[in-house]
A protein has these predicted regions:
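The short loop immediately C-terminal to the conserved phospho-acceptor aspartate in CheY-like receiver
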Residues: 39, 82, 86-87
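Two-component/phosphorelay signaling modules centered on CheY-like receiver
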Residues: 40-58, 127
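Acidic, metal-coordinating helix/loop segments flanking the phosphotransfer/catalytic sites
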Residues: 59-81
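Acidic catalytic/metal-coordinating carboxylates
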Residues: 61-65, 89-96
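Short amphipathic alpha-helix used as the core "switch/output" element in two-component signaling
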Residues: 68, 94-106
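Alpha4 helix (beta4-alpha4-beta5 surface) of REC/receiver domains from two-component response regulators
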Residues: 95, 116-133, 144
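C-terminal output helix
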Residues: 119, 137-150
Length: 168
């Protein structure tokens, strides 16, 4: 059965949960995922899907709210991936993505969009976007892309740690 993240919260709450992410020593690793979308139904459905999979979703209804959250919220320090709608009122997704790529280059950004004009695709393609999720997407696709982004974040973080160690 194929499920999409365009579900009502009551349906999303009944979805089968994926196993949580675990660390090497068996302790729970709960990565934060920032969801930026002006559609409350999509934000809430994604929140349920990601929470059931063991992630800690942080929600923002606009680019401005997402930037403020990352600057002020202590939990934002643990953000391992960002899901950003491309078409939003006010600050559009391309502008938001450019901000996050400048200020948080280690965090992969996944673009969410139902239909994006070519100029947006060109703009985000030059900004190192991690991947693309076309709306509507199955929950499995969303989780696969998010897990891939978290894996990329962990690789970047590990690479940074190895660069910070003194040479012997």
């Amino acid at each position: 059965m194929t499920r999409t993240f365009e579900v009502t919260p009551d349906k999303a709450s009944r979805m089968q949960a994926a196993p949580p992410l675990s660390a090497q020593k068996g302790t729970m690793v709960q990565h934060s995922i920032l969801i930026i979308d002006d559609d409350a139904d999509i934000r809430n459905a994604l929140q349920l899907v990601l929470k059931k999979a063991g992630f800690h979703p942080l929600l923002a209804e606009s680019g401005q709210a997402a930037i403020a959250l990352m600057e002020q919220d202590e939990q934002a320090a643990g953000v391992a991936a960002i899901l950003c709608d491309l078409e939003m009122p006010g600050m559009n997704g391309a502008t938001v993505i450019a901000h996050f790529q400048r200020h948080y280059p280690m965090i992969p950004v996944l673009v969410l969009s139902g239909a994006a004009p070519a100029q947006f695709l060109d703009a985000v393609g030059q900004q190192g976007v991690g991947d693309w999720i076309r709306k509507p997407a199955t929950n499995e696709t969303v989780l696969e892309k998010v897990r891939g982004a978290v894996h990329l974040f962990e690789l970047r973080k590990a690479g940074r740690r190895s660069k910070d160690r003194p040479s012997t």
